[in-house]
Structures are given as structure tokens and as C-alpha cells.
């Protein structure tokens, strides 16, 4: 029974964070707009070289005076909107509470094909087009006269936490937060992810090891040799029982998306970061492992000792929930760290 419950929880998490959910597919007339007690929302668009028109959400505190800090959110992997009319999940709870409680401006972007973003359908959009959009959104900060360009925080959630430095590039950032995230290669991440998935599904240790051996070859062909899963399975029909997703991609995104993630060198990106970094991991996260998250802090501190802080929260899952409730202590943890980072000498 315990194994069955674990498997159900794992499947639920995958459905929430790695595949498109109903929230992203609402028709425009049914969309609920956000409202905040302490902030107003402005709507805009940015573009990328693919011709996509990407919706941005900019919030400004109602009583803001002069230039203020800003939180730039980098979103997750799935085709879910970053627009939250309610605290419908842990990511939404964190976003909404930071907007209402920080006193900072914020900016978010919906990736191609999500929400009101136009152009390439999300299930066809690769990672490079998405990254271009995030970079355009980051550049758009310059147009808002109430934002202090010396006080920009990049907050990456799930997949977005690992790629934060790629979004800002050489532009000034006051600090990075990587929550429920990754700092290794996507190949390493997926092999560990498959082991966890199979174990929580109740497979025996022998079955898990045999499957992981096959997955090492499968993911080499898929991520590194850049073949599609369907083509691989035609070459290796003995692996058909292992594969649980599309012949053209995975978790609702095309194969090219993950092949481009694998091509990234996050070690190089993070070792160049010489500003405060906060890495947050929940001990109950079955999507991004401790090794995935800790890698970021380890890389930064090896290059710049003391710059990164790693915080592991007992019992917290990928959704920032403990016992199915949002971990409310996460908000003051982040806000206190931001205040400290603003007072840290460069």
C-alpha cells in the first residue's frame, strides 16, 4: 500500500509540473485576471526570433515611490501559465505572496503558446526560443522607470532555477534564487529521475537496475545523439516496455527541447556568478533531487567561496508543500535573504 501511495504521488507531481495542465488551455473569455491587495498588474508583450509574441505580467506595489527592487521569475518546464488568479498550487502561492508581501516590482513571462502568448504551440516550442523570450523580457525591465536596475533578483522555479544566469547574461543581478531546481546535465538528472520513478512504482531493485542500464543507452541516443524516442525504439524494440511517453518528445515538450537542455553547460554558467545565490530544496522533492539542487551551490561556492547558501526544508516537495499545505515559512526566508543580499558588498 505504501508503495502504491508513493507511486500515485509521483504520478500526480509529474502531471502537475511536467505536462500541460488545464490551467494553460482555458479559452481567453474564461481566463481569470489576477488581483492583489498591494500591487497593480500591467500587461505587455515581448518577442523572439521565431516571431512569437510573448505575454508579460509586470506588477508594481500600489504605494511605490521612486525606484524599487524587482523580482524576475523564470518559470518551469511544463506548458502552464505563470498567471495565477488564485493560489491553485504551491508555485502560485509563492508567486502571489511575494507579489503582495515583498514591496518589490515583479515580472513574469508566459512561454510560447501558453495563455495569451502567441506563435509556436508550446508542445512544438524548443528551449532556445523560450530562452530568447526570457532574455527579451529581462531586457524589457529597462522600460519601467520605477525599477531599480541595480536591484534585480532572478527567482527560478523548477527548470527555471537552473537556467537563471543564462537569462540575465552579463547584465547586473543582485542575487539568484534557484528553488526545486537543477545544476547538472539533463542526462544525469533523467537517469536519477527514472530510478526514483521506477522505485516508487514498486519495481524490485533488480528490475530498477536493469531498466536504468537500458535507460543509460536510451538517453544517450535521445539527449546526446539527438534522436527522437520513436526512432530509438524502432532500432531497439526491446526497450518499448520502458518508454512511457510520446515518440516525438516527453512531458508535453518536443525532443529538441530536452536535447537543447542537455547541450547547456550549467557548470560554466553558475561558476561565473559572483553575487549572492540561494538554493532551496525540499527533502520530499521527487522531481529534482538533492544532488540536482546542491550542484548549484557547490559550483558557485567552489568558484566564489561563501556566495551560495543551500537550504533544505524537511518534508517539502517539489510544489513547496509540506503535508499538502504550502510551506508559508518559504516567503519570509526568501524576503529576509533578499534584504541581506542587498546589503552584501559586491
Question: Which residues are covered by each model-predicted region?
Answer:
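Short, surface-exposed "cap/lid" segments of acyl-processing enzymes
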Residues: 63-98
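N-terminal cap/lid segment of alpha/beta-hydrolase-fold proteins
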Residues: 28-66
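Short beta-strand/loop motif that positions the catalytic acidic residue
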Residues: 273, 279-281, 285
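Short alpha-helix in the alpha/beta-hydrolase fold that links the catalytic acid
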Residues: 275, 289-299
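Alpha/beta-hydrolase active-site loop
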Residues: 124-144
Amino acid at each position: 500500500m505504501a508503495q502504491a501511495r508513493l507511486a500515485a504521488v509521483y504520478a500526480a507531481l509529474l502531471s502537475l509540473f511536467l505536462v500541460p495542465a488545464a490551467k494553460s488551455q482555458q479559452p481567453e473569455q474564461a481566463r481569470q485576471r489576477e488581483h492583489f491587495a498591494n500591487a497593480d498588474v500591467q500587461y505587455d508583450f515581448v518577442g523572439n526570433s521565431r516571431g512569437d509574441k510573448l505575454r508579460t505580467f509586470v506588477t508594481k506595489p500600489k504605494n511605490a515611490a521612486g525606484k524599487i527592487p524587482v523580482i524576475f521569475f523564470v518559470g518551469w518546464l511544463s506548458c502552464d501559465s505563470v498567471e495565477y488568479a488564485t493560489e491553485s498550487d504551491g508555485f502560485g502561492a509563492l508567486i502571489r505572496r511575494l507579489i503582495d508581501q515583498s514591496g518589490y516590482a515583479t515580472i513574469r513571462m508566459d512561454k510560447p503558446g501558453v495563455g495569451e502568448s502567441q506563435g509556436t504551440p508550446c508542445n512544438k516550442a524548443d528551449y532556445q526560443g523560450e530562452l530568447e523570450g526570457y532574455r527579451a523580457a529581462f531586457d524589457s525591465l529597462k522600460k519601467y522607470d520605477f525599477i531599480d536596475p541595480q536591484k534585480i533578483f532572478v527567482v527560478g522555479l523548477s527548470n527555471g532555477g537552473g537556467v537563471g544566469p543564462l537569462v540575465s547574461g552579463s547584465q547586473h543581478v543582485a542575487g539568484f534564487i534557484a528553488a526545486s531546481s537543477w545544476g547538472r546535465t539533463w542526462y544525469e538528472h533523467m537517469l536519477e529521475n527514472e530510478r526514483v520513478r521506477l522505485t516508487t512504482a514498486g519495481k524490485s531493485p533488480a528490475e530498477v537496475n536493469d531498466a536504468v542500464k537500458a535507460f543509460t543507452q536510451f538517453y544517450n541516443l535521445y539527449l546526446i545523439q539527438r534522436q527522437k524516442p520513436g526512432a530509438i525504439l524502432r532500432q531497439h524494440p526491446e526497450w518499448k516496455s520502458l518508454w512511457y511517453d510520446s515518440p516525438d518528445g516527453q512531458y508535453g515538450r518536443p525532443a529538441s527541447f530536452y536535447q537543447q537542455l542537455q547541450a547547456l553547460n550549467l557548470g560554466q554558467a553558475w561558476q561565473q556568478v559572483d553575487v549572492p545565490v540561494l538554493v532551496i530544496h525540499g527533502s520530499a522533492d521527487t522531481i529534482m533531487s538533492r544532488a540536482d539542487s546542491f550542484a548549484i551551490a557547490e559550483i558557485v561556492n567552489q568558484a566564489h567561496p561563501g556566495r551560495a547558501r543551500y537550504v533544505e526544508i524537511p518534508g517539502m516537495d517539489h510544489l513547496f508543500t509540506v503535508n499538502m499545505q504550502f510551506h508559508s515559512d518559504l516567503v519570509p526566508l526568501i524576503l529576509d535573504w533578499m534584504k541581506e543580499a542587498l546589503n552584501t558588498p559586491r
